[in-house]
């Protein structure tokens, strides 16, 4: 897969309780996972990307706004005297709202940067990675949280 993709899930409820599931999610290729919980609503963790690592994102509690964008390519231009950033296809970040009330897994492909903002208190975001920690640390790029500023409130 070359673009972000949402894998939908569901909730089954009966007299015994509920079961939350994403049955079409395949763990093949996942090497590790980690879980993030911010200390407050509206906290932003962004932007972070990898050339070789893909991720799957799941929110088991609360909700989060997740952004994904192709990684910039850098070209050194001697006549300008610095690096020039080129975004493939001049893309804007794609935005996804993940919520425990509507279970789904978001696939973020390799060569993408991602970030998220918690929309509720006590939100938990789980990341499933296709790289080991050692592989990930050698393939890590970070960008300022407001580089692709998608974090504004959307009052409709």
Question: What feature does the model see in each segment?
Answer:
Residues 98-121:
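Conserved metal-binding segment of the jelly-roll/cupin
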Residues 1-101, 121-156:
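Non-catalytic, conserved peripheral segments adjacent to functional cores
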């Amino acid at each position: 897969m070359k673009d972000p993709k949402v894998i939908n899930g569901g909730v089954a409820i009966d007299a015994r309780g509920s079961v939350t599931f994403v049955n079409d999610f395949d763990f093949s290729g996942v090497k590790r996972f980690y879980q993030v919980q911010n200390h407050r609503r509206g906290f932003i963790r962004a932007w972070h990307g990898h050339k070789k690592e893909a991720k799957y994102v799941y929110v088991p509690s609360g909700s989060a706004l997740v952004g994904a964008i192709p990684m910039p390519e850098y070209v050194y231009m001697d006549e300008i005297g610095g690096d020039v950033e080129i975004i493939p296809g001049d893309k804007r970040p794609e935005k996804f709202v993940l919520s425990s009330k509507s279970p789904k897994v978001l696939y973020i492909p390799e060569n993408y940067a991602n970030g998220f903002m918690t929309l509720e208190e006590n939100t938990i975001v789980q990341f499933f990675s296709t790289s080991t920690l050692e592989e990930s640390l050698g393939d890590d790029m970070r960008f300022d949280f407001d580089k692709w500023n998608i974090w504004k409130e959307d009052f409709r």
